[in-house]
């Protein structure tokens, strides 16, 4: 059976391949389709950032499926590029989000896997930072990087931004990590590390820092 696809339509479908994904649900089921644009934080001014998304079976399908971070394990983009030879992956993880009432509060969000090592993985995501001053409320889009430790057992889904790694939040779980992390960019070697981290522009430095911390703990 041969189906004729007009060249213009074929090109249109091809142009949408960057949206093609395989979504793994918490049930283990895999759903293939095309994720709708505008689900990232940039377009989430009035809803939870990086929490829900919509997809369709084909680029032009009218039937829309909606999923949340509570329903999925990960979103794997099928398109491979030079910068992402394995494809882009968004994972559903718990973000450490302490509050005055609960130091250990977490919120489940979708975060993009940036790099993974033997003992930890690092992620990035964007969210809105809201500040209030005499002029009123100011919103700005901020890119965050965070680290997830592989040895936390059932709690291994938690992703911590550097500021929280440097806090008392991990005092009991990772003795000495707070001080080790704070000193990572200090001194002559630290300045060289900071320069390299700034040039990279990602969170990979956290993997190096954590490996060095583990090596020190093993002595």
Tell what function each PLM region has:
Residues 1-15:
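Bacterial Sec-dependent N-terminal signal peptides
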Residues 11, 29-30:
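Eukaryotic, compositionally biased intrinsically disordered regions
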Residues 15-16, 31, 216-219:
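Intrinsically disordered, low-complexity regulatory segments
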Residues 19-26:
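A short beta-strand micro-motif
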Residues 21, 31-35:
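Conserved glycine-centered beta-strand/turn positions repeated across beta-sheet architectures
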Residues 26-27, 61:
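Short strand-coil-strand connectors
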Residues 34-187:
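Aromatic-patch recognition
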Residues 184-219:
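C-terminal partner/receptor-binding element of secreted or periplasmic proteins
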């Amino acid at each position: 059976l041969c189906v004729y696809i007009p060249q213009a339509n074929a090109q249109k479908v091809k142009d949408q391949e960057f949206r093609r994904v395989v979504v793994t649900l918490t049930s283990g089921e895999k759903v293939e389709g095309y994720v709708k644009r505008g689900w990232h934080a940039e377009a989430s001014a009035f809803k939870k950032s990086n929490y829900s998304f919509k997809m369709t079976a084909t680029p032009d399908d009218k039937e829309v499926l909606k999923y949340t971070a509570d329903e999925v394990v990960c979103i794997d983009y099928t398109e491979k590029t030079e910068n992402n030879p394995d494809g882009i992956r968004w994972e559903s993880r718990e973000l450490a989000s302490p509050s005055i009432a609960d130091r250990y509060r977490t919120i489940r969000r979708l975060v993009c896997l940036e790099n993974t090592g033997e003992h930890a993985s690092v992620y990035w995501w964007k969210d809105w930072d809201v500040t209030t001053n005499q002029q009123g409320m100011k919103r700005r889009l901020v890119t965050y990087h965070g680290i997830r430790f592989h040895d936390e057992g059932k709690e291994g889904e938690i992703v911590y931004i550097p500021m929280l790694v440097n806090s008392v939040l991990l005092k009991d779980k990772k003795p000495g990590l707070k001080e080790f992390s704070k000193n990572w960019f200090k001194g002559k070697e630290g300045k060289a590390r900071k320069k390299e981290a700034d040039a990279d522009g990602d969170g990979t430095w956290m993997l190096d820092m954590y490996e060095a911390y583990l090596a020190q703990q093993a002595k």
